[in-house]
């Protein structure tokens, strides 16, 4: 039973990863989020890794600072299977987007892409990425 105390709960890990995702989407540092909450960046790290649980009132504060509803942190949570959530294709697609935006490259690509205002340039960039992906698949 001692092992369970040292192993983070999957829900805590998920909530932490969603905090990290939203924080990085906003370009906010752990230090800045910690300052806004009156805690250290180390505590933010522990929340994001799921090693420390985020209390309800703290999660409410985090949601206000990151400008998302509290429910955002529980979207696609483990054990949240089924009947009332989005369809399987939607959940799969949602997880793919979360994984993409959780990576450093994905976040950089997203930030750069949204700065491109010309729709023709955006379309050409999407076509280029699709061509590169198709080439990589055929190898």
UniProtKB/Swiss-Prot annotation:
Read off the PROSITE patterns from this record.
Answer: HTH_CROC1
Q: Name one Pfam family in it.
A: HTH_3
Which InterPro entries does the UniProt entry name for this protein? Cro/C1-type_HTH, Lambda_DNA-bd_dom_sf
Every copy of the HTH cro/C1-type domain together lies at 19-73
Q: Where are the transmembrane segments?
A: none
Name the Gene3D superfamilies on file. lambda repressor-like DNA-binding domains (1.10.260.40)
Which SMART domains has this protein been placed in?
A: HTH_XRE
Where is the DNA-binding region?
30-49
Q: Which UniProt keywords apply?
A: DNA-binding, Transcription, Transcription regulation
Q: Which GO terms describe its molecular function?
A: DNA binding
Q: Know the name of this protein?
A: Uncharacterized HTH-type transcriptional regulator R00410
Q: Which organism is it from?
A: Rhizobium meliloti (strain 1021) (Ensifer meliloti)
């Amino acid at each position: 039973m001692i092992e369970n105390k040292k192993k983070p709960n999957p829900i805590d890990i998920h909530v932490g990863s969603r905090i990290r995702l939203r924080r990085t989407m906003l370009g906010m540092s752990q230090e800045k989020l910690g300052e806004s909450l009156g805690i250290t960046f180390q505590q933010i790290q522990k929340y994001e890794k799921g090693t420390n649980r985020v209390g309800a009132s703290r999660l409410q504060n985090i949601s206000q600072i990151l400008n998302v509803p509290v429910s955002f942190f529980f979207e696609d949570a483990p054990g949240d299977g089924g009947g009332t959530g989005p369809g399987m294709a939607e959940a799969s697609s949602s997880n793919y987007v979360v994984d993409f935006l959780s990576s450093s490259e994905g976040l950089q690509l997203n930030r750069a892409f949204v700065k491109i205002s010309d729709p023709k340039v955006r379309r050409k960039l999407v076509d280029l990425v699709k061509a590169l992906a198709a080439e990589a698949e055929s190898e």
